[in-house]
Amino acid sequence: MLISETTPKEYVSYLEKRNYDYFVVGDEHVDLRQALELFSVKFKAKKVLTDTGRILGNLLLEQGLVDEVNLLVHPVIVGEKSYNVFGNISQNLKLKLRKQEKLDKGLVWLVYKVTN
C-alpha cells in the first residue's frame, strides 16, 4: 500500500490493525517516482506492470515514468458508453511500434516504446 505523509492517521491505524504493509512515499500526495525507486531498491524490481485502468496509467505516463505501452485492440466498436483511455494526459506522447501480434478471436496486441 502506498500512502503519503498526509494520509489520515485513522487510515494508517486501519492498515496497521490488519497487518497490511504500507510505504510512505511523498508529502501531500503519493510520489510515484519515489515509489518506483523504492520498488527498485527494496524489491529489486526492474519492471512494473499496471493494468488498473486509466487513472494510474495516465499519471505514470504524464510524469514520464512509462517506457512501454501495450494495447489490446478488440474487434468491437463501442458506442456512446465509451471513454477516452488517455483523456487525462495533457501532452502528446510519441510512440514507436515495437511489436504487433494477431491473437485469437480477432484481437491484436500492439507494443509501443514511448520515445519522448
Q: Where are the model-predicted features located?
A:
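Enzymes that bind and transform nitrogen-containing heteroaromatic metabolites
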Residues: 1-116
